Amino acid sequence: MSKKILKIKDLYKRFGDNEVLRGISLALNEGETKVIIGPSGTGKSTILNCINMLIPPDSGQIWLDGEEITDHVNVKEIRQEIGYVFQDFGLFNHLTALGNVRIGLIRVKKMSKEKANQLAYEELERVGLVDFADSYPAQLSGGQKQRVGIARALAMQPKLILFDEPTSALDPELIGEVLTVMKDLAQEGMTMLVVSHEMGFAKSVSDEIIFMEHGNIVEEGPPQQLFENPQVERTGEFLFKLTELYGEGENS
């Protein structure tokens, strides 16, 4: 039986009069990759922010590896277990690539500088950036910055990594290098929940695709089902429009 790393039950979140999440329930097994798709403003990123305790849900429950974390007092402890790759990279501009990757190891995990350096170099090598360890964010391309962000998340050795539209801030020619790293991670068995409009990645890499609209999950299932035989008409309409707009991406 697969080990359940993430479970969400009846998650609700409102911002003023706008109910962004309307009873979201989903689960993610160890080693699975699920991709959340849907129109802008439908609550996709809010789910990730609730999981990582950046935004408290109004109601509902979240479990990480069997432990309920919804009202967890020690947020820092939870965030050690959950990697987060941001849309806008989220790097510290005054730190080198190496410094950005090791900072959490030293400050949060209280690792020695020597051990943190070793692990940070290993993760930079994993994403193909060991030669840029001493470069600052201003000296890196968008794709390189995002790969540093992925290396930083990996260095914490999390149980789960959340990706919030990791390619949306990139020039088209740089998207492929980030998706290649993510594809490799999926093949290595990393547990990932990804918000993305990259249909090629979703189709070829994800175990399941979750289509959201108006704060609800409209349909969830294997890529083949959603692309070739959607059970809900709206799913087919959205995927047709999205594929027409963006194409099937780098990894189709």
Model-identified regions with their sequence ranges:
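ABC-family P-loop ATPase nucleotide-binding domain
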Residues: M1-Y12, Y246-S252
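ABC family nucleotide-binding domain
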Residues: K3-L6, Y12-P223
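C-terminal boundary and immediately downstream tail of ABC-type ATPase nucleotide-binding domains
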Residues: Q224-S252
